[in-house]
């Protein structure tokens, strides 16, 4: 059986912490910012921790070596 390859799109979008959690960037900051409040824009900064069940699926299917 060949080795599983890491999906290159997932490699760019997700980061796995040392404890096995998956970090991702908040969506919704590409365009259309004029209609959002400053608080909404501020809350979209930085990274978030994915729910465990979703993060486990990301690791299993898209980042098998990560």
Swiss-Prot record:
GO terms for cellular component: cytosolic large ribosomal subunit. The keyword Ribosomal protein applies. Keywords: Ribonucleoprotein, Ribosomal protein. One of its GO terms (molecular function) is structural constituent of ribosome. Pfam families: Ribosomal_L35p. One of its GO terms (biological process) is translation. NCBIfam families: rpmI_bact. Belongs to the bacterial ribosomal protein bL35 family. This is Large ribosomal subunit protein bL35. The gene is rpmI.
